[in-house]
């Protein structure tokens, strides 16, 4: 007598077991929840000092402090570069009294000296003779 061939039972068992897709979905949902919690924890953590002085796009988004400093272009600290000279210090030399007023005020138009030419004297002389 021949023994009948048995069908593999594993194929039937796979239909009865829950699919692995649902377990993968649960794992990814848990990972996302953990990432969200880590991000919230990082937001509430005080900012650490960053010594990166480059202003390229990659370095601007390096960390939260770099983004606040470089990415937004807003700087809340005092900047020493824009200091003006104190008012007590005189930047201009005292005006000399022998100079004319136009020279002190800085008129850019020079005064023209009129030269008498023989033609103008001849014309006026002819006018008197008539």
Swiss-Prot record:
Keywords: Activator, AIDS, Host nucleus, Host-virus interaction, Phosphoprotein, RNA-binding, Transcription, Transcription regulation. Pfam families: Tat. Residues 79-91 have a biased composition (Basic residues). Belongs to the lentiviruses Tat family. This is Protein Tat. The Arg-rich RNA-binding region binds the TAR RNA. This region also mediates the nuclear localization. Coiled coil: none annotated. GO terms for cellular component: host cell nucleolus. This isolate is from a Gambian case of 'neuro-AIDS'. Residues 1-33, 78-130 are annotated as: Disordered. Residues 23-33 have a biased composition (Basic and acidic residues). The keyword Zinc-finger does not apply. The gene is tat. Transcriptional activator that increases RNA Pol II processivity, thereby increasing the level of full-length viral transcripts. Recognizes a hairpin structure at the 5'-LTR of the nascent viral mRNAs referred to as the transactivation responsive RNA element (TAR) and recruits the cyclin T1-CDK9 complex (P-TEFb complex) that will in turn hyperphosphorylate the RNA polymerase II to allow efficient elongation. The CDK9 component of P-TEFb and other Tat-activated kinases hyperphosphorylate the C-terminus of RNA Pol II that becomes stabilized and much more processive. Extracellular circulating Tat can be endocytosed by surrounding uninfected cells via the binding to several surface receptors. Endosomal low pH allows Tat to cross the endosome membrane to enter the cytosol and eventually further translocate into the nucleus, thereby inducing severe cell dysfunctions ranging from cell activation to cell death. Through. The phosphorylation by CDK9 does not seem to be important for transactivation function. It comes from Human immunodeficiency virus type 2 subtype A (isolate D194) (HIV-2). The lineage of its organism: Viruses, Riboviria, Pararnavirae, Artverviricota, Revtraviricetes. Residues 11-22, 99-108 have a biased composition (Polar residues). Its main location: host cell. Residues 50-66 are annotated as: Cysteine-rich. The modification Phosphothreonine is found at residues 85, 89. Binds human CCNT1. Also binds to CCNT2, but the resulting complex is unable to bind to TAR RNA. May participate in the formation of a complex composed at least of Tat, P-TEFb, TAR RNA, RNA Pol II. GO terms for molecular function: RNA binding; RNA-binding transcription regulator activity. GO terms for biological process: positive regulation of viral transcription. Gene3D superfamilies: Tat domain. A motif (Nuclear localization signal, and RNA-binding (TAR)) lies at residues 78-90. InterPro entries: IV_Tat, Tat_dom_sf. Residues 67-77 are annotated as: Core. It is found in: Host nucleus, Host nucleolus.
């Amino acid at each position: 007598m021949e023994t009948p061939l048995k069908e593999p039972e594993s194929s039937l068992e796979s239909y009865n077991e829950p699919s692995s897709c649902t377990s993968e979905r649960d794992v990814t949902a848990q990972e996302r929840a953990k990432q969200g919690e880590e991000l919230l924890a990082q937001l509430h953590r005080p900012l650490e000092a960053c010594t990166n002085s480059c202003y390229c796009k990659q370095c601007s988004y390096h960390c939260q402090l770099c983004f606040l400093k470089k990415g937004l272009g807003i700087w809340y600290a005092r900047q020493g570069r824009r200091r003006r000279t104190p008012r007590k210090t005189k930047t201009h030399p005292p005006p000399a009294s022998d100079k004319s007023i136009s020279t002190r005020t800085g008129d850019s138009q020079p005064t023209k000296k009129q030269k008498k030419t023989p033609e103008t004297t001849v014309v006026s002389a002819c006018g008197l003779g008539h």
